[in-house]
Amino acid sequence: MSQKFLFIDRDGTIIAEPPTDYQVDRLDKLALEPDVIPALLALQKADYKLVMITNQDGLGTSSFPQETFDPPHNLMMQILTSQGINFEQILICPHLPEDNCTCRKPKTALVESYLADGVMNSATSYVIGDRETDLQLAENMGISGLRYQRDGLNWTQIAKQLTQRDRHAYVNRVTKETAIDVNVWLDREGGSKIKTGVGFFDHMLDQIATHGGFRMDIQVSGDLYIDDHHTVEDTALALGEAINIALGDKRGIGRFGFVLPMDECLARCALDISGRPHLEYKAEFNYQRVGDLSTEMVEHFFRSLSYAMACTLHLKTKGRNDHHRVESLFKVFGRTLRQAIRVEGNTLPSSKGVL
């Protein structure tokens, strides 16, 4: 699998660039840009490999002797390394613009090895720098560029932009009985729009989204003139598939979740996003319907959902009121799902290496 890389400029991006001569040639000129260390640590944790690429005009000549460049550069590297920041390579072009070399940014000679097939994931790699030449380099490499600005797109914002996930999936399911559109955003909250034609079922699905801490839009056209069976079943299948797709490779998720009490009922839920579908369910109801939802379809919903989502799900509730018992199951599932889909790191939560 190709790797995601960050190609990062030095002067004006990692360290401050002196406005007078644009050369960091003394120790007293060395100053890190604000928040660069925590940002680079966060980016490393998100599995980015770091490459420093910098133009150093006339390095090694009388205008910029190597012996004046090395002390501040080496100190910068010592500071970064001491904080756990590791650069795969330090790429330096020492030439002047008039030298017409092939390695000066925005030309790509220094990064040719990364442009070979299968080395770099171009969709998830970036050039980060404070100059237009950095953005031109990104364009020449076929990747995206980010223009660093201390008072604009700063390191805190860059780290947030590149590490914050927006897990989304869309599923369209059409059968002879139903037509269903499901959108799921696991990293957004609020604003869910749900219309299945079964009012109480809409309310229950909203409980999953609200207590699960994510957003979903569900639009259903079903054969309700017969009953609610196909509408509930197919919605569960489409929703489970959408959640499963949105989870992606499941890297970094909590995977497990469990909750006990809910309302005056005692509702229990244990969840493992394991890739192995299974449902254990125990609930009894006094009546055949709650509102316009058949109570027998509650178990069928969760069974269909668990199989489409490829998860192991244990659900149980006790109580006196059917409305509360049904609602407790949807609420407790939502709260449990919130724990399981939360991103807690960047490793796959399985000793098998796959979920």
Swiss-Prot record:
One of its GO terms (biological process) is L-histidine biosynthetic process. It is found in: Cytoplasm. Mg(2+) binds at D9, D11, D130. It comes from the Bacteria. Keywords: Amino-acid biosynthesis, Cytoplasm, Histidine biosynthesis, Hydrolase, Lyase, Magnesium, Metal-binding, Multifunctional enzyme, Zinc. Its main location: cytoplasm. This is Histidine biosynthesis bifunctional protein HisB. It comes from Yersinia pseudotuberculosis serotype I (strain IP32953).
